[in-house]
């Protein structure tokens, strides 16, 4: 119960910071896990796609490394790798350029969860540093999220995972389990409400001739003359205009470049929850097999000596 209240308190604090940031700073469409948490009961759609792809439209690679097999009730590492060029900068919410952030969601089998601090080995703690992981929600301790965090120092994220013990955890078995990961680098192109961020390409809403372009503090106002009148398209600062006054455009034609340098990727892997009794039997079998081969060799040599001795007579 105490852990539950602690978890809820953490979520309230995060939500409070997000509200304050939304009021006093421009919405940045970063890798805030709370966006997915507030809009989706599960981070994975029925199609298998992770919902983060709804906001991060570009596809980028991601990799995950886990042990081939783990023993019950043990702590192991799940290493998520998010490769990208650290020299590249992204468009921030205010239109300026800045470093990329990263975020990730790790979907574990039921029963697997974030390892408690007192169970994490010191060597693993040094790899985790001060990173903060949290469950996707109170009902899904097996789904972990992190981000946004600075990407230049966190292109590899080590998740400390505690495996279940089938002897104590009902519904878990000594079998092979799937693990899924989704990770992004950089800001998203779409907000959860469907509106665009300033980290994507903008298109002309109508066909016509551009009669005026006014640059304001936070946006461009582009006047397009049509046969039915003038339509003004608003483009936030960030993407660069690729049209000029006097140009003719058609509906859907790009009027800016695509400033996005990031993207999202997902990957699946597997881990075996190994029964320690099977390992003991396997070791015993290997020992017996080895001893059997040794005895066979000794018996063969003994037989050869007897044969040689008989031949001498």
Curated annotation (Swiss-Prot):
PROSITE patterns: CYTF. Heme binds at residues 32, 52, 55-56. InterPro entries: Cyt-f_TM, Cyt_f, Cyt_f_lg_dom, Cyt_f_lg_dom_sf, Rudment_hybrid_motif. Keywords: Chloroplast, Electron transport, Heme, Iron, Membrane, Metal-binding, Photosynthesis, Plastid, Signal, Thylakoid, Transmembrane, Transmembrane helix, Transport. GO terms for biological process: photosynthesis. GO terms for molecular function: electron transfer activity; heme binding; iron ion binding. The keyword Ligase does not apply. Belongs to the cytochrome f family. Component of the cytochrome b6-f complex, which mediates electron transfer between photosystem II (PSII) and photosystem I (PSI), cyclic electron flow around PSI, and state transitions. The 4 large subunits of the cytochrome b6-f complex are cytochrome b6, subunit IV (17 kDa polypeptide, petD), cytochrome f and the Rieske protein, while the 4 small subunits are PetG, PetL, PetM and PetN. The complex functions as a dimer. This is Cytochrome f. The gene is petA.
